[in-house]
Amino acid sequence: MIDDVAVAATTQTGDQGLTIGRTSAILAGLPQSVPGYAIDRMCAGAMTAVTTTASAIGIGAYDIALAGGVEHMGRHPMGFDADPNPRFLSEKLVNPEALNMGNTAEKIHDRYPQLTKERADAFAVGSQQKAAKAYQDNKIQPDLVPVSAGSESGWSLVTKDELMRPESTLEGMKDLKTPFRPHGQVTAGNASPL
C-alpha cells in the first residue's frame, strides 16, 4: 500500500493546482485512502518531494511513497505582468529579484567572478557530451522508466530523456540570450533544464 504521494509544481494553477499530489494519486487509480500533497519550492520542488518522502521512509513513517514533479510550461500564466502580492514586497517578505532560479544563478556568478559565462558554457557542452555518451553506452537506460504521454494526436510511450542536446557547441552557446539580465551569464544552454 502506498502511504503518501508528494508532487511538486511551481505554478499551482489550473490543472497543476488542486493539490496536484492528491489529484495525481486519484487520476493514477490509487485508492481514495491514499493521501497526496503539493510542494511549491520553485526549481527544487521535485528534489524536495523525493527527499521528504525518502526521509519519511527512512524514519519508518512510510513503507512506500511516490514523489515527483510536474511542470507544464504551456499552462503557466506568462506575460500577464502578475506581480506578487504588494504586501509581500512592502513588508519585505519576498525579494522580487530572487523569485526564480535564473536570478539565483546570476547571483552565484556575481559572487564567484571566476565562474565566467565561457566556463559555464564549456561545462554545459561537456555535460551534454557526457550524457550522450552515457546514453549511447547504455548506462542511463536502466534508470529510465517509460511513461505514456498524451497529445492532440494520441498517446505515445516516452522512453528517452528529451533534454540531452549532444549537438551543443561553444559556438552555438554564444548566440543564446541571457533572459535574466542584460549581458548576463545564464542562458537556456548553461542552465539546468526543466
Question: Positions of the model-derived regions?
Answer:
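Active-site-proximal alpha-helical scaffold in enzymes
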Residues: 39-70, 109, 113-139
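Short beta-strand segments at enzyme active-site cores
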Residues: 3-6, 67, 141-144
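Helix N-cap / loop-to-helix initiation motif
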Residues: 1-3, 115-116
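Conserved catalytic cysteine-centered active-site region
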Residues: 5, 9-63, 96-103, 167-193
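Glycine-rich nucleotide phosphate-binding loop and flanking beta-alpha elements
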Residues: 13, 72-74, 131, 193-194
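Flexible glycine-/small-residue-enriched beta->alpha junction loops
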Residues: 54, 58-111
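Short, well-ordered secondary-structure micro-motifs
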Residues: 17-18, 76-78, 157-161
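N-terminal extracellular/periplasmic Venus flytrap/periplasmic-binding protein-like
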Residues: 119-194
